Amino acid sequence: IKFYHLNNNSKIQLSKLEIIVEELENYKKQNGLIDFPDMLDKFIESGEAPSLRVIFIDEAQDLSLVQWRLVKKIEEKAQDSYISGDDDQAIYRWNGAHVSTFINLEGERTVLDQSQRVPQKPFALANKIIKKVRNRVEKKWLPKKEEGSVRYCNNLHEVDFSHGRWLVLAQANYMLAGIGNILDEKELYWQRRHAVPRVKNIYEIIQKWNDLKKGVPLHYNDIKKIAAKMTKDNWDPKLFKTIIKDGFYDIDTLKEKYGLKTEAEWDEALDEVGDEDIYKIKKLIKSGENLDKNPRISISTIHGVKGNERENVVVITDL
């Protein structure tokens, strides 16, 4: 509620917010629950701050009001505190970040004036945009020596993703599905941030199958993954159930005792893998993609990727 009054741009009616807060508090009381803000409040009200020589606070522009109260409490018994952040990177106001507290901090201020990441042309564009933001700390800093480039495209189809590592960023999660569809149309190897792509999982099973065919004994856990990608035409499920779960098995033993019926190439043997995935994996291998590694291309929301970096970044400007 306090943040509501401080945030003039709130899109929710105060009456609705009060109902939500009341119902949430009732739910927590009825079920004996506390949440993270409750933990902070309890420590601020009755906790004992430790005596510390120094404290370090990072990404301070993203702290909420209650988190700032926690910092102040800990500072009471600390000899020194170092607080780092950048108000120009404050993109979590929607999540309660109170940037004004960071901007108005008292104490000695040091600006890191040399970027190790940002090339010259992206630097110029970023500074042109950030100057439109009101209530910020003016700061002078320099880009690295590389010139870099800034290009404008009408759509993702115009972007050449064939080389290098990429981030493709959008404002909201609902936009990512459409981005993924376009990357699929372009037959590219990509992933959603923090998610392992399906084709990578399948490719790992393909590699295990190839090892098995070469005579390499595999542990039950790997055998189970291979069997899961075969229909009963290629592996008898009843005989598979008799396998001892802690053992290692070669292909001859699996055929003799445990129901394996084939030594075909992976695209025939792993007949539970869909035709679309088979086509995509073959296409990616032919194009030179290394499916043993994570994809060169990641898609994410702008908020979800904060702190990451790539040599190529595409920003979708749709809202």
What residue ranges belong to the model's regions?
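Ser/Thr-centered flexible coil motifs
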Residues: Q13-L14, S64, H219, G274
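Conserved helicase motor core of SF1/SF2 NTP-dependent helicases
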Residues: V54, Q61-E147, L167-I182, Q191-K200, ...
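Core RecA-like ATPase module of SF1/SF2 helicases and allied nucleic-acid translocases
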Residues: Q120-F123, A170-L319
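Conserved interdomain hinge at the start of the Helicase C-terminal
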Residues: S149-G164
